[in-house]
Amino acid sequence: NGKALRRVVVTGLGIVSPIGNHAAEVAKSLREGHSGIVRCDKYAEMGFRSHVHGAPEIDFDDHIDRKLRRFMGDGAAYSYIAMGQAISDSGLGEKDVRDLRTGLVVGSGGPSTSAQVVAADLARQKSPKRVGPYAVPKTMCSTLSANMSTAFGMRGLSYSISSACSTSAHCIGNGSELIQMDKQDIVFAGGAEELHWTLTVLFDAMGALSSKYNETPQKASRAYDVNRDGFVIAAGAGVV
């Protein structure tokens, strides 16, 4: 109709990562050149080629009520914490978050693989009745948007995009478009990923993970270096 696209700005952000569990901590780590990549002995014991990963140091019990946590895999839990930070950082109130014009576009590369394996093991080794109803919100591909929209009582547009390592970028881009096209006034966007051997083994089998720097894990993540030999798997969440 010839109308100019609306301007989009970032008013708040939240992050959980191997180098900090808050924006200020992450910024400090980046300035000081701190690496969150460490050796994982479990990978070595299991016979993986890659023995390094990045794991956030955070206690979910300090941040998430047990009744909410039972619906979440670790990725959704990271996302919940990051989104809470983004809400606080933006200065938005509960009424703003629950407004029909406030949306949510968050995703992950996949569901909670650890929850999938646990459910399968329970069904095979004990009984399907032991799996329980909480496995579904952990293992569906829209686990992040389902958990976040429910936990924060959101009523606007809400869905997940999953596109491998581009997931969060696509979610943020799509969230921006929703505002530009006047479909929403506010959108929370980003992504999260859990860290568990059940996911790591898949990329290790592909030969996609770094294995040359197992004894020097802090040097393993070097995406644009001529001596790179794969990516380093890690966990965390980021929401704007």
Segments predicted by a language model, with ranges:
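ACP-dependent fatty acid/polyketide chain-elongation machinery
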Residues: 1-68, 90
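Acyl-thioester C-C bond-transforming condensing/cleaving domain
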Residues: 4-5, 21, 35, 40, ...
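Conserved catalytic-site loops of classical short-chain dehydrogenases/reductases
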Residues: 103
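A glycine- and small-residue-enriched flexible loop/hinge segment at structural boundaries
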Residues: 42-92, 106, 141-155
